[in-house]
């Protein structure tokens, strides 16, 4: 970005789920570290100052899972890179629960589970949840005290805050995977840029940044994708997808501006857009608000878009050219099947565009099962991330 010179750079990630039965997760994490060092070396500012894993780094909280993460830090990080960890529900899955997880964490990592670090003059506050993904009175008091210290140092500078669950009412994924027990504290500190995980929501979803009282950012997953919509034909977890490997790279300059860039380890590339927080301490300047739902930008099917329906028995499979959009990506599609004889709707199905995959396929498809014999008209509409329905649709006739 022009006229932006970093004085701080860090990785914010979540949900590594280290598990020796699934070695690709830690392998992809190690690969991501190497890629970010190479990226840093290509820049004028060459440091990678910190790496954060924001909870659920150990799939079942077992000793060897925590040790694999510690080994990754020891073997992959350079001496001038600080690592920061929080724990949450999956670390507590071990035998002995939360108490055992706390003991293991201290023994293996040698640091407290709640931390306040200052890196290059910027405050990093990280808190481990309790009782799963909750915050008791002791945690709340600690959070407030540490935030007070950070803001007393400089109220006109971002404060980077880390906890595993999303804050309800903020980033994508918060509906099912959010908590509200510290909202009343955080909203008094607009300087906060809050990083969270838990949901496995894609980092390239533009709803993974949100601003209202403060700035919130989702940090992705190294396990599977999960999405925060409940009308899809296969539930919230898209089937037959490779394990995710995503995080965000965060940079700050001497003015306190913060640049956030979603990254995909599997394709070794950034997603091609970035989020700039100009003045984190001033909510009146926030741009990533719910006003984005008022967009006039809508998906559309190109003139040469194709649609085909193949019938096998009483099942029909539709495949079509993906819609286009001038900003972001297409979120999902709705397929409506009407009986030709009376135009009555007999099926409605919704499914994702696979926008969370860096290299989106050029076509999309879905199967409509168990249709009675007859003639039908099928219609496909597209939708963006902001409930912005496509300006046109694709239509095909078929018979079973």
Tell what function each PLM region has.
Residues 12-14, 49-56, 82-89, 160-164, ...:
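Active-site neighborhood of phospho(di)ester-bond hydrolases with catalytic His/Asp-centered motifs
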Residues 62-154, 178-188, 204-241, 245-252:
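Extended active-site neighborhood of metal-dependent phosphoesterases/phosphodiesterases
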Residues 207-303:
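Binuclear metal-dependent phosphoesterase catalytic core
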């Amino acid at each position: 970005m022009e006229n932006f010179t970093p004085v701080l750079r860090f990785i914010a990630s979540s949900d590594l789920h280290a598990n020796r039965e699934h070695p690709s997760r830690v392998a992809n994490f190690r690969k991501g570290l190497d890629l970010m060092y190479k990226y840093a070396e290509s820049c004028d500012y060459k440091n990678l100052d910190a790496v954060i894993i924001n909870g659920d780094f150990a799939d079942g909280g077992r000793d060897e899972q925590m040790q694999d993460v510690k080994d990754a830090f020891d073997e992959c990080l350079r001496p001038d890179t600080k690592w920061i960890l929080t724990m949450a529900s999956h670390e507590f899955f071990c035998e002995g629960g939360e108490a055992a997880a706390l003991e293991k964490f201290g023994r293996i990592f040698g640091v407290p589970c709640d931390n306040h670090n200052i890196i290059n003059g910027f405050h990093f506050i990280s808190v481990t949840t309790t009782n799963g993904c909750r915050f008791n009175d002791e945690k709340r008091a600690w959070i407030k005290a540490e935030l007070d210290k950070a803001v007393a140092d400089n109220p006109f500078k971002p404060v980077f805050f880390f906890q595993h669950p999303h804050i309800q009412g903020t980033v994508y994924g918060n509906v099912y995977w959010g908590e509200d027990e510290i909202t009343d504290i955080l909203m008094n500190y607009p300087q906060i840029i809050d990083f969270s995980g838990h949901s496995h929501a894609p980092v390239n979803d533009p709803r993974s940044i949100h601003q209202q009282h403060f700035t919130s950012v989702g940090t992705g997953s190294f396990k599977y994708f999960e999405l925060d919509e409940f009308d899809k034909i296969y539930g919230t977890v898209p089937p037959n997808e490779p394990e995710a490997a995503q995080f965000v790279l965060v940079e700050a300059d001497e003015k306190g501006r913060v640049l956030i860039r979603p990254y995909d380890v599997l394709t070794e590339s950034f997603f091609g857009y970035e989020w700039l927080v100009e003045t984190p301490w001033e909510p009146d300047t926030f741009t990533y608000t719910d006003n984005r739902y008022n967009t006039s930008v809508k998906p559309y099917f190109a003139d040469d878009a194709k649609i085909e329906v193949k019938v096998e028995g009483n099942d029909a499979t539709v495949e079509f050219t993906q819609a286009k959009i001038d900003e972001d990506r297409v979120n999902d599609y709705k397929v409506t099947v009407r009986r030709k004889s009376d135009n009555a709707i007999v099926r409605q199905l919704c499914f994702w565009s696979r926008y969370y995959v860096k290299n989106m396929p050029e076509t999309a498809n879905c199967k409509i099962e168990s249709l009675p014999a007859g003639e039908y008209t099928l219609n496909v509409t597209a939708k963006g991330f902001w409930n912005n329905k496509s300006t046109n649709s694709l239509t095909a006739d078929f018979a079973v």
